[in-house]
């Protein structure tokens, strides 16, 4: 059974063999021709010379220290990274994944086998909708998908809360729970799931990207630990419906935060995003 976990790792390994080198890394190694060839594959050939020039200029800058993360012009990007990390975890996604069999038992699935099968179904929805998100990200943009997914999560979590609260729904609770969790997972998979990791790879200047991304990643797993450790206690003390409603409130706050602070990075180069940060433009319009 545990050997099945090696299958996605092998698929990832094989897929990585076909990934091209980063043009920035190639230029840092003075491999200009290879960098140009890769840029010509993914960009308009007419703009390649200009982009090579901009990348070369960026590479000449020295790596930034930890103190630079506190500079006013970088602070908005740091807030976005930590904010999205909090929203991704505090809307309860890993709680649902970790405790899905328990949640289905709460809903009335008495057989452990059926609960596990329902959990597997939720996982399949997650994989399929993540593939859909990959296809849509560069077509619709990050912000529209983020808003759509958060709205879907809010609705799903609210419905789940009512399903556990209203006695007259007890007979239908099983299937409302399955449908609600499937919609919740699907909404997450097209929005917060991939977009958090994509955004933190795009919004930070090259000099401090490693440090800034490490902070966002540590924040993400810290919030994950806190939420996972508190779910069962919260469901016991507040009630199962209140737990889902609390996650819905976090999703509402996340929607407001995303509208005002999360930038649209579709079609923008890393250098253009950094220039917008330095110029002090409204981050929403980066």
PLM segments and residue spans:
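Short intracellular "coupling" helices and adjacent cytoplasmic loop segments at the cytosolic face
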Residues: 41-51
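Loop segments that connect adjacent transmembrane helices in multi-pass transporters
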Residues: 33, 49, 53-57
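Alpha-helical transmembrane bundle of multi-pass membrane proteins
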Residues: 1-40, 59-286
């Amino acid at each position: 059974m545990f050997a099945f976990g090696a299958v996605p790792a092998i698929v990832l390994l094989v897929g990585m063999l076909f990934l091209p080198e980063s043009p920035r890394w190639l230029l840092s190694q003075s491999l200009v021709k290879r960098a140009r060839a890769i840029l010509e594959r993914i960009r308009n050939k007419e703009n390649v010379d200009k982009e090579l020039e901009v990348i070369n200029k960026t590479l000449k800058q020295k790596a930034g220290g930890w103190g630079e993360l506190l500079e006013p012009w970088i602070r908005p990007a740091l807030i976005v990274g930590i904010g999205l990390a909090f929203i991704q975890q505090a809307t309860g996604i890993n709680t649902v994944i970790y405790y899905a069999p328990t949640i289905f038992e709460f809903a009335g699935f008495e057989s452990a086998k059926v609960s596990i099968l329902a959990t597997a179904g939720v996982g399949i929805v997650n994989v399929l909708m993540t593939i859909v998100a990959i296809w849509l990200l560069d077509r619709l943009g990050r912000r529209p998908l983020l808003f759509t997914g958060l709205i879907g999560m809010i609705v799903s979590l609210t419905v789940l809360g009512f399903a556990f609260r209203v006695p007259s729904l007890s007979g239908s609770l099983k299937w409302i729970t399955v449908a609600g969790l499937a919609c919740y997972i699907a909404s997450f998979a097209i929005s917060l799931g991939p977009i958090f990791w994509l955004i933190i790879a795009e919004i930070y200047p090259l000099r401090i990207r490693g440090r800034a991304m490490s902070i966002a990643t540590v924040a993400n797993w810290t919030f994950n630990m806190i939420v996972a450790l508190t779910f069962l206690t919260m469901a016991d003390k507040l009630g199962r419906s209140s737990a889902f409603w609390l996650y819905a409130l976090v999703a509402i706050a996340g929607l407001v935060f995303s509208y005002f602070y999360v930038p649209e990075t579709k079609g923008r180069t890393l250098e253009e995003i950094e220039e917008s940060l330095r110029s002090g433009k409204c981050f929403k319009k980066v």
